[in-house]
Every structure is written in C-alpha cells, then in structure tokens.
Amino acid sequence: MSNQSFRLVLGIAAIGFASISAHDAFGAPPTVPFGVEFKGCVESIGVALAPTENVVALTPPGFIPVGIGTPTSPIVVRTADCAGISVDGGKSKPGSVVQIGAVIVPPAFSGEDIDNYTFWYYTSDERLAHRLRKAGVSAQHVETIDYVLEPGMSGVPNHLAVVVPRPGDPRFAVAGTVASSVAPSGAFRAAWWQKTAAGNVRMDTTVPVIAIGAADLTLATRPDNALGALIGATTLGFPILQQFNVFVGAHMDVFVAP
C-alpha cells in the first residue's frame, strides 16, 4: 500500500505502578516537553470498531470520536518493539510500547496523519513510563511485555504474538500473522493525546521513512476488564485497517498542547 493510500484509508476512518521519586535513579528533569528516539522498530497497527457509547464514555469533553452520531467508532490498537528507545538523550535500550485509543477529531490540528485519544499506554521502558507519568499521562510500566515475532522473509507471513501481562491493566493479547515489506512508503506522523491536570498532553511521533506490510491479527481479552467492556466482547478483529510496519527510526515529542 502506498503512503498516499495509507493516508486515504486513515482519512476515511478519520482515523503504552509504583511511583518513582523525582530524585531517584532518573534524576529530576523538567516534566515537559521532552523527546524520545526509537530505533530499529517493528510495529503492528489495527483499527477496529467499538460501540460509540462505550468509546464516548472513555473520551473526555473536547475530544470528538470520529464515529459520533453512529453506532460504532474506530479504535486503534498499536504494538511496537524497538532495538533502542532513548528518552531525552539517555542511554538507548531495547523496549516495547503498546497503545489503545480512539480515533478522534482533535482540539487542534497541526498536519498529522492521524489523531488518537489514549485510553491505555504500556511500555517495558521504565524511564519512558516514568517521564510520561511525570507529564500526567497514565502510562504503565510493564517490564515483561511479551513481543514474539517469528523470523521470516520479507513478504512471507510469519507469526506475531504480543501479550500485556500483569501489572498491565487491562491485560490482553494480540496475535496472528504478519508480512513485512521492504518498500518505503514515505513519512508518517501520528498524535496521541491525553487530558491531564496540566492540560492536553500530546505525544507526536514522526517516522521519516516507513515500510508498510500486511497483517491478520486478533485481540483477546477478558470480559470483566475495562477493555472487554469497551469492545463488548472477548475478542476483536480489525476490519478497518491492519498493518505490520518496519522503520529504522522515529522521534516522539511530548508536550502540553497550547
């Protein structure tokens, strides 16, 4: 799929806890803004539909789910695993990020390809979780996110399984087949938002060059947790959009929107 087609699909859909002292091992840097570098990453993207009333219940005023006025609204499930994550120029370490949120019409638009409101954010990178929480984002540090990608050739389906265990809440898994691509599709920019006591925090990620592949994935969760309540089921497919992407590097800016 070309980058132009990808943007079109997203347009049609109008589509990561113990607290850590500011003087612990991470020091006491400014809360926001700050930057994050991601290196050598694979990423799955799934866009599904959930009952609009359930999506609205998790979305604060000022953020408009794109399905408002219709029975269902698109939600995004993103998983990423990187060879290196570096927060504010710190040491780069391997890590994973998992995000779930609603595709929204944002309070302010600045040229991004997609805007999402963050329901849940999980990361295995302790420093990233710490900095996001300092910024007011409800990021969860889940040290043992299981991200298993079977080795495979480009364009040939292979198995992907991502499991968010305790202390992640809600817990869930995403699994299925994916096929990577080596064909670059240009740049992509996504903004994930969350309302905090300090204001609306944006997590803007720019990927200069991304290779967009295919995926056939299913999410599984428990009926008695918040995710099961959101989707109204224990399993969820992704009929709107599924992708498995590869990129060499990306940069995320975290800041309070003016």
Predicted regions: what is each one?
Residues 1-10:
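Bacterial N-terminal signal peptides that target proteins for export
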Residues 3, 17-19, 122:
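Intrinsically disordered, low-complexity segments
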Residues 9-21:
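Bacterial N-terminal signal peptides
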Residues 19-27, 102:
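Signals and flexible motifs at protein termini associated with secretion
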Residues 26-86, 217-236, 240-243, 251-258:
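N-terminal domain-onset segments
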Residues 82-167:
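Aromatic- and glycine-enriched beta-alpha-beta binding-site module
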Residues 135-258:
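Interaction-surface and assembly-scaffold signal
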